Amino acid sequence: MKVSKVIEIFLDYHRNHSRPNTVRSYEAILKKFGLIFGDKDLEEVSSEDILTFLSKITDGRKQQTRRIRYSHLSAFFNFIINNIDERIQNPCAN
């Protein structure tokens, strides 16, 4: 399954189950993530991809910003594992 498809599923879920600020926060990071990895299959996203992506979008920002964005990506992959495909590995967990 493509990353872009799962991003939409994840965001739709949170639009119905989370607070607006939480949704906006997820949208901000996942839209950027989707621009780079949207056409990739989930299985193709590696830990190295995650670290490179975070370096690009958090360059010059506080460590707390990097942690929050990493946490959002980890939550995204955990959602996939728990709700869509348990065979997927969370690249944030490595």
Description of each model-found segment:
Residues 3:
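Gly/serine-rich nucleotide phosphate-binding loop at the start of the catalytic core
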Residues 8-21, 28-94:
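N-terminal core-binding DNA-recognition domain of tyrosine recombinases/integrases
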